[in-house]
Amino acid sequence: MATPGRPWAQARSAYRASEVLRRVTGRRRDPGPQSNGPGREDARAPGRLARLLRQLRAEAASRSEVPRLLKLVERAGAGAAGAGERTGAHSRGSVCSVCGEPRGRATYPAGVLEVSERRLQEGLAAVREELGAEIEALRAELRAELDALRALLPPPPPSPPARREPRAVPRAAPRGPTLLRTLGTVSALVAASRPADDAPDGPAECGAHRAPARKNHKKMPVPPGAPQGGGD
């Protein structure tokens, strides 16, 4: 008597095995370069194969004969392992496209970074030269347009003459001390230029020399014994 649910489990196992076989066949038909490292689906494929093999072996253990589906899955697993070994041997001397370090699963051969860098430098040099030529042409065109605009503009008005700033007049020093010093100097010179005979004998005669003596109209008392009159 058949166990209930067994056909559904077999159908599900067959579907999984067919999916695995389809993916393995697709990888064999497309030998082009893959991305660095296995993808998410490819990384899960060996685990799925292992689970499927365990399920099929458990089912085959309950039967006396090994089903044909188990043989197909084992053959597909062996083919996937051989393809992985060939890919590893092919990419053994390759380097990473990002960091340049040797990696087992890299798809770029050794030396490709140097070639890519050289081509990139050549391309950059060509672009730089082309841009420099275009910039020079634009500069010449702008210079010609500016010259034409300057020719159309009216001449500028004459600039006014430069104003001279008034010169600062030095302020006069106070006259009092200077005048006193000048008078003192003149008095000293006059006193030094007089002869020695005309020098006054005392301070009383200084005023008589400077100004004539005024005539005294008052009668002076005559001492006794003195001649009277204004004779010679």
Swiss-Prot record:
The lineage of its organism: Eukaryota, Metazoa, Chordata, Craniata, Vertebrata. Residues 211-220 have a biased composition (Basic residues). Residues 19-47, 80-101, 151-179, 191-232 are annotated as: Disordered. It comes from the Eukaryota. Belongs to the FAM246 family. This is Protein FAM246B. Residues 19-31 have a biased composition (Basic and acidic residues). It comes from Homo sapiens.
